Amino acid sequence: MRKLIVAVLIVVALAVAADFAAAAYAEHTLATQLRQELTLPSDPSVRINGFPFLTQALAGHYTAIDVRATGATVDPLHDLDLEATLHDVDAPLAEVTSGDMHSVRAGRVDGRIRIKDTDLGRAIGIEDLRIQQPSDQEIKQLLPAGTPSGESPHGDRAPVRMVATTDLMGQRTEIIGVGLIALTGGVVRITVADVRLGRDGVGAVGLPRAVRQTLLNALSTTVKPGELPFAVTPTRVWVETGSVVVEGTAANVSLSGVSRSSARCVALQCPLTLTSQSSTRQFV
């Protein structure tokens, strides 16, 4: 009896190992093909969810596939994270193993771009920029009524807190700006409504009017971070600690020839629309 149990365990272990090996091969093949289709500088990370893999492969249907590429460039941003979750993917086994994606199609794709605060700060000339979610008190006192909170369902507007250290009247000083991020037609507009010194409380007015206005203009900016993966139209924006996330959803997406125009921009560093109301980053 013991020998039978051991034999069964060995068979199960070998089956699991074979399943993981097959999944790893398929993920590698898919990553290589997606690198070509999206014209990425390196293979993205690909994870095929669900177990066992071989059952999904034989059926030619996958519940969900996660794709992530890091360090993408759309000038002047140089450290974008591109992410996508592909749901209900139909992919014949022969195409998965051969790398041919002609018939591969996803029922739904959730695509997103993650803009890191360090990357955005370099682009607008604020090297130590930190992006955070504002407190409930800041949202209530400083932003218009009806502004969504950080816990609200993601929409086309989100509150943002921007912290930076700058030269102010000859001294290195921490400043805090609170405002709104709005997503319109794929363009991310950051409008700072209030700015204060880091040592001041919420709503404090401790800055001269001219300096305050200059800081408001310096922190407000407009960014168009390219198209989302798989030609997904961006419809939602929100703030996480350290980044701004732009997301959208598309239905019935073919993975053959996906988003070639935006992919070329990632590879060739096409110009990105980024403007600020003020180019001044040092204040006297």
Regions found by a protein language model. Give the residues of each.
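Hydrophobic membrane-targeting and insertion signals
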Residues: 1-58, 71-76, 256-284
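A short, surface-exposed beta-strand/turn
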Residues: 82-92, 177-186, 261-284
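Hydrophobic membrane/lipid-contacting segments
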Residues: 87-94, 149-209, 244, 249-250
